[in-house]
Amino acid sequence: MAFSPLVDQLLETLRVLPGVGPKTAQRMALHLLERDRDGGRRLVAALGEALEHVGYCQRCRTLAETPLCSICEDARRDEGLLCVVESPADMLAIEQAGGFRGLYFVLHGHLSPLDGIGPEDIGLDQLDERLAGGSVEEVILATNPTVEGEATAHYIAEQLRGTGVRLSRLAYGVPMGGELEYVDGGTLSRAFNGRLPFAQESS
């Protein structure tokens, strides 16, 4: 069965979203057209507003509606700690976990020479400028534990060599609640290499 040209156009447009295939796009479109046209109008309005007004923080490069995001504007954050992440989603995950009170720098990707993505494409020139300010004492590399993420972390580490800025990497290992028999070999090996002294609670 073929829908009208406008419906077909809507289906095709919905498929630009990650993880949305033909069937999912059809369910979304038909739901909005049949059952929730008001919701569809709100979606269009919100998306239009976001596309029009959301840009990038001039300091950390995360998504923001103002020149500086709320985190960069927060005087309570520790300017000496700078966490480098690949995406705004990674930054949000760290914020939601709580515990980190430093600032961020968002790469919006990782180095990938085969895809033509070099240092300037992920803002490493801007990271150099940020570090040249002198307020950063430690850089925490929180790139993903993938081949590209590791390559990016090593590149940044080379950039920092001789600058006097401390460098650390997020620890990776066995997840809380996980069982060793289900942990892959690479993760288990990294957990052993990054093991810490056992802190016993005083009775």
Curated annotation (Swiss-Prot):
Keyword terms: DNA damage, DNA recombination, DNA repair, Metal-binding, Zinc, Zinc-finger
Chain intervals annotated as zinc finger (C4-type): 57-72
GO molecular function: DNA binding; zinc ion binding
A Pfam family reported for this protein in Swiss-Prot or TrEMBL: RecR_HhH
Domain Toprim residues, every copy: 80-175
Keyword DNA repair: yes
Keyword Cell membrane: no
Transmembrane segment boundaries: none
GO biological process, one term: DNA repair
Family in the record: Belongs to the RecR family.
Name of the featured protein: Recombination protein RecR
